[in-house]
């Protein structure tokens, strides 16, 4: 089978199977009837979530509050103490607490920086998208704003790079890094001020450019129907028992195949339908005036390529569905069946026995792709269990302890996954990620430990999200002792103070040397330094950081701490 057609149709089928990767109910008559009914349900659910996302976007646009916190525990501070010759026993956490909002012509962010729950300073960042001007301020340093003209800053950076390049060429030296940076600037769309304006306008008015949920649902159903029209059903095979981890279900296998000529016919119909698809035309024209024209040119080129006569060598794509007696689809697979080999593309399975569940997913050939499999128990809609993620052919026999010379896998313990919340688009769960302690069955425990320094570490992930808020926490433990964590939380619909750019006073142009000298002359560090000391930072360490010297150096004189005092 022609490689282009095999890959394109396999990707199309895999994407559709991915949408239906859930235990679905279907009246079992043929593969196409089963999977088309399942896909229609999946598309309907997707369209509902898509429509709901527009409401969430409005809340996001009005304002969002974010907290990002890095915490070090006692063991983490002790570990870092081996690498850094400074006292960090006083440090507990650092946090950035920000309020962010977007409008068509502006972005606003006001953030507080905290250390050990003590506020150190405030960061203000405003982006005037209409004039492409950025305003920044740290009021604890100085009340005035630094203004950066986006276009002028790009031109200045480009001029510096060009000057460096000319200087190196004169001296006979060539800097590949400088050449790459220049080429990147010239080719980047973000170097074009007009593109920046249009891009930000698109982001802040996203719902206006995107199709309605009903339109999206219609388009997805239209083109998936074309695919199923070209899949040939084979007779259902005898029943097969899926038995994993003591969980078993008896199923009937239904198969659909797509030959080389069928794949070509499918792609031709997709192209021909897309050429006259008014809904696609409306969507693309809403995004960009020239996008639909480019799309039609691409369809024309594809149509010409599809007119090539293909030799049918008997190879085909095979898709299978395992259906239980109560018409649940519990397994799906997709393979490329060549004349001399069968290449796995996708295999998903989920079988249950009362409150027990086994699930697996594999992508690609066994020696090249990845596989994840495991089992757990659902109680009160909460799933707990263990899954193993493997790359390549890395089979591990837990009973015999036999492992290959090199094992690449991660154990995933699911401690509490809310199976009800996810149906409403919310994610709630607690997970831990570990690495195998055995690298080689022939090696001693000491050798295994030496070859796998990560065996004693665990990554702990906690997710708790609702429609208007969310929190993600990632922590690291060693031998069960916490080292530290990163926590990110957000709340939608927060009111953000939005200044009028025309009303901003005491503005200093970053491109004006005299203005910047005036700005620097009025900076005072008193407030920030006092806040750092109040947070618990030792004064000796503070002086060391300021001077770049040692903790034994003398304290800075008053005039260096406060330039205004010197004047």
List where the protein language model places each region:
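Cytosolic-facing loops and C-terminal tails of multi-pass membrane proteins
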Residues: 2, 21, 372-374
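Bacterial N-terminal signal peptides that target proteins for export
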Residues: 2-11
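Hydrophobic helical h-region of N-terminal Sec-dependent signal peptides
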Residues: 13-17
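C-terminal segment of classical bacterial N-terminal signal peptides
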Residues: 18-26
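Subset-of-secretome marker
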Residues: 27-567
């Amino acid at each position: 089978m022609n490689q282009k057609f095999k890959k394109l149709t396999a990707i199309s089928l895999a994407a559709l199977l991915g949408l239906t990767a859930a235990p679905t109910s279907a009246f079992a008559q043929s593969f196409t009837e089963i999977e088309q009914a399942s896909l229609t349900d999946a598309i309907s659910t997707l369209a509902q979530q898509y429509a709901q996302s527009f409401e969430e976007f409005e809340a996001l646009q009005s304002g969002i509050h974010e907290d990002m916190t890095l915490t070090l525990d006692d063991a983490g501070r002790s570990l870092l103490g081996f690498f850094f010759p400074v006292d960090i026993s006083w440090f507990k956490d650092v946090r950035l607490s920000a309020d962010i909002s977007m409008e068509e012509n502006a972005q606003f962010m006001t953030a507080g920086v905290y250390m050990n729950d003590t506020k150190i300073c405030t960061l203000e960042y405003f982006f005037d998208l209409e004039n492409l001007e950025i305003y920044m301020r740290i009021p604890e340093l100085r009340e005035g704003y630094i203004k950066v003209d986006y276009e002028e800053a790009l031109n200045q950076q480009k001029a510096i790079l060009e000057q460096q390049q000319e200087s190196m060429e004169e001296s006979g030296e060539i800097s590949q890094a400088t050449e790459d940076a220049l080429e990147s600037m010239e080719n980047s769309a973000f170097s074009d001020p007009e593109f920046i304006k249009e891009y930000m306008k698109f982001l802040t008015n996203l719902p206006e450019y995107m199709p309605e949920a009903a339109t999206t649902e219609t388009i997805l159903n239209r083109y998936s129907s074309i695919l199923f029209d070209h899949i040939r059903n084979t007779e259902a095979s005898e029943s097969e028992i899926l038995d994993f981890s003591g969980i078993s279900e008896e199923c009937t296998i239904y198969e659909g195949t797509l030959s080389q000529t069928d794949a070509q016919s499918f792609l031709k119909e997709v192209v021909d339908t897309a050429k006259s698809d008014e809904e696609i035309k409306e969507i693309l024209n809403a995004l960009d005036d020239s996008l639909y024209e480019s799309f039609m040119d691409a369809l024309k080129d594809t149509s010409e390529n599809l007119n090539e006569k293909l030799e049918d060598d008997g190879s085909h794509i095979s898709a299978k569905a395992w259906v239980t007696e109560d018409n649940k689809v519990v397994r799906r697979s997709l393979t490329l069946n060549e004349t001399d080999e069968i290449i796995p593309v996708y295999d998903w399975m989920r079988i249950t026995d009362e409150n027990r569940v086994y699930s697996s997913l594999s992508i690609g050939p066994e020696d090249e792709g990845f596989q994840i499999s495991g089992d757990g128990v659902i109680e009160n809609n909460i799933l707990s269990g263990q899954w193993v993620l493997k790359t390549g052919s890395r089979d591990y026999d837990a009973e015999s302890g036999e492992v290959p010379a090199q094992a690449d896998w991660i154990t995933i313990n699911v401690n509490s996954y809310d199976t009800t919340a996810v149906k409403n688009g919310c994610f709630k769960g607690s997970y831990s990620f570990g690495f195998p302690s055995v690298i080689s069955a022939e090696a001693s425990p000491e050798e295994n430990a030496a070859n796998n320094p990560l065996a004693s570490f665990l990554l702990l992930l906690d997710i708790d999200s609702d429609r208007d808020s969310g929190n993600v926490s990632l922590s690291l433990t060693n031998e069960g002792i916490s080292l530290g964590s990163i926590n990110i939380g957000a709340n939608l619909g927060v009111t953000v103070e939005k200044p009028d750019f025309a009303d901003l006073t005491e503005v200093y142009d970053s491109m004006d040397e005299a203005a910047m000298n005036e700005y620097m002359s009025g900076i005072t560090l008193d407030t920030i330094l006092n806040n750092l000391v109040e947070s618990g930072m030792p004064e000796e360490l503070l002086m060391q950081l300021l001077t770049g010297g040692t903790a034994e150096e003398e304290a800075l004189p008053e005039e260096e701490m406060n330039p205004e005092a010197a004047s």
